[in-house]
């Protein structure tokens, strides 16, 4: 767990990696993610990251674990492309930090999560323990969808 930043590293064989570097947007600014999960969404035409971050009007959520964002990653530079960032699951006051990604078909990927009703009364912001399945519908089929 890191209370300051999130990091990324690349390697060719899955065993040996370059030195970790802090996740940033393509303009060089800090991604703002820390202390929680991030997951890859893969498509044959792009690599995407699902994450939480600070700086999204979300100081009301423990460790800024809502909303869930998704953005495309430049795999050569290991940066998140800011212009591609979208909000997948909204901030309703509860934590969304424990989530999963699953390829359902060549045309659809889901990001699933639930509202973690931790202390601090997240219900006052609209949370009620919802379960989410954010559906990503691809314009072009992802022929890699079942090759994990």
Labelled PLM ranges:
Residues 36-39, 95-102:
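Beta-propeller and closely related beta-sheet repeat lectin domains
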Residues 99-112:
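Acidic, serine/threonine- and proline-rich intrinsically disordered appendage/tail regions
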Residues 1-32, 44-46, 52-92, 106, ...:
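Beta-rich carbohydrate-recognition and catalytic domains
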